[in-house]
Amino acid sequence: MKTKSTIEQNDSNKKEILADFKVGVDNVIFSVDTAYNRVFVLLRKRKEEPFVNWWSLPGTLVRQGETLTDAAYRTLAEKIQVDNLYLEQLYSFGDPHRDPRENPDCFGVRYLSVSYFALVRYEAAKIIDKSNYSVSWYKVDDIPKLAFDHDKILNYGWNRLKNKLQYSPIAFDVLPAEFTLNEVYQLYCTILGENFSDYSNFRSRLLKLGILLDTGVKVSRGAGRPASLYKFDAEAFKPLKDKPLLFI
């Protein structure tokens, strides 16, 4: 039977042992397909233990001398080829025993995941998969059970993406350099749902922000009158960067 002093001694010993962390980066890479109103996330099938043959988020251990962001970009570049993207650090996940390779009986090696989320356009992203692993796009509403705690990381990233769209201009990081207002609206509709705002109110609010430049060029894309092409004005946005904004 353990006495109070024995328990206190064990707790004291554990406090003296520092965890040896291996730091990894896991990417939640979203792609938006406005043509068919779909949002995908990139998954890879694991070919090694633990969780062999399970789907997981693309990830890597951070190399010596490599920054976290560099590791995130490296992982992304190994999986897809894309010109325009948005990438942001998401959150750190480091609960004990989140990885089965940790020893459950002592404070030994721990696995810390610093997660990032990225947004790309589906039609602009090409899977290149330089490894032997299977990589595929999965619709966000049809995700299989993921390895480790990647379900938790994915849900966190999905919520961050939806919130971020409402107060920051991340959509313009993934759109072409010149775009119509309807293309912006369709991107928002695809991610936030068609009922988030009607087009006229969205258009009015976006133009009032004063961060778009009319190029003076009109294009015909589908039925209806030719639409104006706009560009994102990064200089006009600078004074607004730290102010609360609502894009919808």
Model-predicted segments: where are they?
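Acidic, metal-coordinating catalytic segment for phosphate/diphosphate chemistry
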Residues: 1-26, 103
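Charge-enriched amphipathic alpha-helical scaffolds
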Residues: 195-213
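Short helix-coil junctions and helix-kink-helix linkers
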Residues: 187-196
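Active-site segment of metal-dependent pyrophosphate-handling enzymes
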Residues: 21-23, 40, 70-73, 77-126, ...
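N-terminal strand-loop-strand
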Residues: 15-55
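Long, intrinsically disordered, low-complexity Ser/Thr/Pro-rich regulatory/activation regions
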Residues: 214-248
